[in-house]
Amino acid sequence: MTFPVEKVRADFPILQREVNGLPLAYLDSAASAQKPNQVIDAESAFYRHGYAAVHRGIHTLSAQATESMENVRKQASRFINARSAEELVFVRGTTEGINLVANSWGTENIRAGDNIIISEMEHHANIVPWQMLCERKGAELRVIPLHPDGTLRLETLAALFDDRTRLLAITHVSNVLGTENPLPDMIALARQHGAKVLVDGAQAVMHHAVDVQALDCDFYVFSGHKLYGPTGIGILYIKEALLQEMPPWEGGGSMISTVSLTQGTTWAKAPWRFEAGTPNTGGIIGLGAAIDYVTSLGLDKIGDYEQMLMRYALEQLAQVPDITLYGPAQRLGVIAFNLGKHHAYDVGSFLDNYGIAVRTGHHCAMPLMAWYGVPAMCRASLAMYNTHEEVDRLVAGLTRIHRLLG
């Protein structure tokens, strides 16, 4: 069955607008995806008709808002096939989720002389928290290097592990290269050394189904805004055995059981002890609507359509004069490139004049830029609402830029 891309596009009001007098071609969903009416309407309806502070309220609005919030927790647990909804923590996004693990589990379990393994393709959100933890604890940060094609040099991975390796923190899909890492093999190797595994799933969950039980990872984190949901909300999955042992990393309301000026404070049970303060309930409702939306379309159908579009885009872009494409042939979501010796910002500015939105810069992956020896790249990302015609416009725009700039 043909993927109903035009029907999908009709659900996204922003795709109807023009930029610089031309129809918007939004090729920046890896940075943040646009929102369908179903998400916008769900969050708006909550604020119009159902808003109240959650937890402890005895009045109807509070009870209903709390129930709605907890229903999304259950919904998200089914979305990634967690054993229990109580293994899921609401966070502001992937960055906060990783920092939570670093500051809670990491503070308790990392000692001087231990080591943590990451890769050279990580987003800064999966580098900097571990650098900070290692500096604080006197631990070592080890790095899996890259092959020129943008895949990890997995033949080096076994040598990085030893009996002091405590954590493998790895991206599921690179936000620059689109590389999907072979998580089952990597996780199996980590298990041989007794190491825990954190997976940054920010660039994966919108492209295909994720099963955290099948992966057997200890932590999995993703952001709602890349999944066609609101900003400021995400999900951190923590395997239950670890969750119960982890102390809170922020203090305040909602995460306590009792507070006494003389007897100290006791914590709420997990996951609520990791959710200090008033939550982003509207964002949670919107996230639930986003999960409903992609589930109704079918992640397998979304993935098949996006892969067809990706193959077409790579074939067409390869014909642009003087273009450099980065990353493997088999990839998800993104195409990073440079055009001749022109700075990515200049290329992106020209494309914007043509109504085409791409991301330019280091993409929060400065070590990866350094590996390739470039200050920046352009990145076009393909989502379920993008079309062959938009790919053609990108190719035509780049060809025109090459002709103008030489």
Swiss-Prot record:
Gene3D superfamilies to which the protein is assigned, alphabetical: Aspartate Aminotransferase, domain 1 (3.90.1150.10), Type I PLP-dependent aspartate aminotransferase-like (Major domain) (3.40.640.10)
Annotated pathway: Cofactor biosynthesis; iron-sulfur cluster biosynthesis
One of the protein's GO biological processes: cysteine metabolic process
A GO MF label: cysteine desulfurase activity
Active site, UniProt feature: C364
Sequence positions bearing N6-(pyridoxal phosphate)lysine: K226
Keyword presence, Cytoplasm: yes
Catalytic reaction equation(s): (sulfur carrier)-H + L-cysteine = (sulfur carrier)-SH + L-alanine; L-selenocysteine + AH2 = hydrogenselenide + L-alanine + A + H(+)
Cofactors (names): pyridoxal 5'-phosphate
UniProt feature coiled coil, ranges: none
Entry EC number(s): 2.8.1.7, 4.4.1.16
Location relative to the cell: Cytoplasm
Signal peptide: none
Keyword Cytoplasm in record: yes
SUPFAM superfamilies per UniProt: PLP-dependent transferases
Keywords: Cytoplasm, Lyase, Pyridoxal phosphate, Transferase
Main location: cytoplasm
CDD domains: SufS_like
GO cellular component terms listed in the entry, alphabetical order: cytoplasm
UniProt family annotation: Belongs to the class-V pyridoxal-phosphate-dependent aminotransferase family. Csd subfamily.
NCBIfam families, alphabetized: PRK09295.1, sufS
Protein purpose: Cysteine desulfurases mobilize the sulfur from L-cysteine to yield L-alanine, an essential step in sulfur metabolism for biosynthesis of a variety of sulfur-containing biomolecules. Component of the suf operon, which is activated and required under specific conditions such as oxidative stress and iron limitation. Acts as a potent selenocysteine lyase in vitro, that mobilizes selenium from L-selenocysteine. Selenocysteine lyase activity is however unsure in vivo.
Oligomer and partners: Homodimer. Interacts with SufE and the SufBCD complex composed of SufB, SufC and SufD. The interaction with SufE is required to mediate the direct transfer of the sulfur atom from the S-sulfanylcysteine.
Protein name: Cysteine desulfurase
Organism field: Salmonella paratyphi B (strain ATCC BAA-1250 / SPB7)
Source taxonomy: Bacteria, Pseudomonadati, Pseudomonadota, Gammaproteobacteria, Enterobacterales
